[in-house]
Amino acid sequence: MRRLFLFIFLSVIICNSAFARKTGCEGDCENGIGTWTYTDQTVYVGGWRESLKHGQGTVTWPNGYIYTGEFVDSKWQGQGTLIFPDGAQYIGEWFNDNMNGQGTFTWANGDMYVGEFIDSKRHGQGTRTNADGTIMKGIWKEGELAESN
C-alpha cells in the first residue's frame, strides 16, 4: 500500500511538472521577454509588461496562423504581419486586434490589395490587383469597391 501511495504521489508530481512546462511561462512573462504556451498549444514569444503582451512578439497557433508584430496591452497594435494557414497574409498597421490603417493583403492565389483598412475591412483608398492582371482602384467601403478612379 505504501508503495502504491508513493507511486501515485510521484506520478502526480512528475505529471504536474511536465504539464506546467507545457502550459506556462519560460523566461520573464511579467516585465521582460518570455515564452508562454497555452493549453491549446498556442505559443507567444516576446515582450511582456505588467503580465500583458507588450512590444515585439510572435503568436503561433496550432491551426497554422502566425502573427508577428507589435503588441500594446496584449492587443495587436502598430506594425504587424498575419500569415494564414492557406498562405494568405496581411502586412501593415493594426489597432485593437484589427487591420487598421495602411496595409497589404495578399491572397493565396496571388490577388493583392494595397491600401487602407478599417476594422479588418478594405475601407478608404486602395488598389486590388488580381492574379489575372485585373485592377480595381478607387475608394473602398466595408470591403467593397464603392468608387472607381
Predicted segments, located by residue:
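Sec-dependent N-terminal signal peptides
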Residues: 4-13
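Short, solvent-exposed mixed-charge patches
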Residues: 147-149
